[in-house]
Amino acid sequence: MKIAVDAMGGDNAPQAIVEGVMLAKQDFPDIEFQLYGKEAEIKKYITDEKNITIIHTDEKIASDDEPVKAIRRKKTASMVLAAQAVKNGEADAIFSAGNTGALLAAGLFIVGRIKNVERPGLMSTLPVMGEPDKGFDMLDLGANADNKPEHLVQYAVLGSFYAEKVRNVQNPRVGLLNNGTEETKGSELTKKAFELLAADETINFVGNVEARELLNGVADVVVTDGFTGNAVLKSIEGTAMNMMSLLKTAILSEGVKGKMGALLLKNALHGMKDEMDYSKHGGAVLFGLKAPVIKTHGATGPDAVRYTIRQIHTMLETQVVPQLVEYYEGKAE
């Protein structure tokens, strides 16, 4: 299997990206990595050249570039070349920590969506508290700001497919994010989506779920519109960061006693931090495209890159995308 890597994407590129690839090489000797970017800079961090190909380019897409314009005008940008490699069959998947909007555009306009998938969704696997090996898939997280009820139903299908094939969740429970659990709650969008989801016998729909319940594992797949999903994701990220910051401040404010207490609780505190770190589940997938297109956080480090490559390996190994293509071809007949 071959993975096209945008080595210049992200705040810490290319160092964090290449170091993460070096870690992943130890886990997956069957992967061939294509690193797109400035060859001289990339080579600084390569410790083993086996299964590594560098495709040199001086051009990259910046974090503040307008996504669609950047994809169209910067034809030799590292991200664009990586996406083209997937389109041309020279690579099986693309990974980037760069401009999210540009990667979404590259995924849609270059890699292409699966026939009969109207709106591919941006999806992440988020943690379930108290169960570190478990998680839930949530989409859409920002690929589509405006959605129709039918899109949310399609997200339920996409999320269920991923949960079952990639995360090995049998008959995944699907929840609709809403401002209350009652059937009558919500906007016109969620009310209509509720009706459609409840009527679809192929979806294991468990009803409305509230944001406060998400991390308790109330559902295996949570669907929502892209605007709401993105806001909820950032709220979860912000809450996690602030909790750790508050805890640190409280400990330091107690002086020596606080530091001694923290030392005694060191393992528990590390466990708490790890449990809230959803990067262990990999990156965000733009699911519904003809190949895996994966995005990680711009400030990602080597470990997060390693986890994301593990995720891509699983997606390719389980052939989840070809199975999804077959599923939608069958629905069209």
From Swiss-Prot:
Keywords: Cytoplasm, Lipid biosynthesis, Lipid metabolism, Phospholipid biosynthesis, Phospholipid metabolism, Transferase. InterPro entries: FA_synthesis, Phospholipid_synth_PlsX-like. Signal peptide: none annotated. Its EC number is 2.3.1.274. Its main location: cytoplasm. Belongs to the PlsX family. This is Phosphate acyltransferase. It comes from Enterococcus faecalis (strain ATCC 700802 / V583). The gene is plsX.
